[in-house]
Amino acid sequence: MLRPAGLWRLCRLSWAARVPAENLGRRDVTSGVSPRGSTSPRTLNIFDRDLKRKQKNWAAQQPEPTKFDYLKEEVGSRIADRVYDIPRNFPLALDLGCGRGYIAQYLNKETIGKFFQADIAENALKNSLETEIPTVSVLADEEFLPFRENTFDLVVSSLSLHWVNDLPRALEQIHYILKPDGVFIGAMFGGDTLYELRCSLQLAETEREGGFSPHISPFTAVNDLGHLLGRAGFNTLTVDTDEIQVNYPGMFELMEDLQGMGESNCSWNRKALLHRDTMLAAAAVYREMYRNEDGSVPATYQIYYMIGWKYHESQARPAERGSATVSFGELGKINNLMPQGNKSQ
């Protein structure tokens, strides 16, 4: 017999020659995709990148890909908002892991002079969404970027970096290709993403099969992001989190949409399949534990947003320790010397 409350704790614990960008014209395509299966010697090889390429290619060539674009379009618009928050223009920008171009559609040519859109999936690039910005499509792996140092004024990435095997190296490469005083703005799924689905599958599989395998890929913890960005060389960091909750008729509809997004699990240690009765049990657990009043079930997508700047001498820096000319002990005296009307009420 399933005991959801008793098992809740179980659920919760669980580089390609460098190409100068300015030599590429509109609609040109270059490739920086790594050899299949290649990874950095120090990489934790968690994800099957060839499988992820196939998943994204399959999703991009479906008859109605826009049916599954809702989440990536929403996060893409929020990345665009953060770009607009910076009062400057960006002559050359890169969207890393662009998919079908979910960020570019929300930006304009007054803000972005030229946009490079890079993705591991060629079908996503071929079926990209319309934008008024001059664009260049680049077939490239996020782990092996084919660009020279100090190339871009802006790099953005939305819901792509959670699939790389070596996130520290990917961030280091992003920093490398940014110009001094360039900025990186990214978004990736957080650790609580799809916790409802994860828990339901674990509970059902434990009950029916005597144990469970990971069916949802692992995510980076928010506490690690600031450290990783700093280690990659970024400064003036901002990291914040948000949650988007989407309601579905049931668990199977959620899983269908994840497949349509190209977000199916690609971990090497994934289980090939689940028995039919285990899937039905998981759907029942999902509905029992998380059902809304209208009968739908929620799915939570936790999003980490990050902003980091490449150092330039013009950037504001904190004053050196001990450079203050007034001590805290003298603040009272200064207050007494101020005109009465200037004192705070």
From Swiss-Prot:
Record's keyword terms, sorted: Membrane, Methyltransferase, Mitochondrion, Mitochondrion inner membrane, Oxidoreductase, Transferase, Transit peptide
Gene designation: NDUFAF5
One Gene Ontology molecular-function label: monooxygenase activity
Functional note: Arginine hydroxylase that mediates hydroxylation of 'Arg-111' of NDUFS7 and is involved in the assembly of mitochondrial NADH:ubiquinone oxidoreductase complex (complex I, MT-ND1) at early stages. May also have methyltransferase activity.
Main location: mitochondrion
Any Pfam family: Methyltransf_11
Protein name, entry field: Arginine-hydroxylase NDUFAF5, mitochondrial
Cellular component aspect of the GO annotation: matrix side of mitochondrial inner membrane; mitochondrion
Compartments, record wording: Mitochondrion inner membrane
Subunit structure: Interacts with NDUFAF8, leading to stabilize NDUFAF5. Interacts with NDUFS7. Interacts with PYURF (via TRM112 domain); the interaction is direct and stabilizes NDUFAF5 protein.
GO biological process per UniProt: methylation; mitochondrial respiratory chain complex I assembly
EC assignment: 1.-.-.-, 2.1.1.-
Protein family per UniProt: Belongs to the methyltransferase superfamily.
Interval spanned by the transit peptide: 1-36
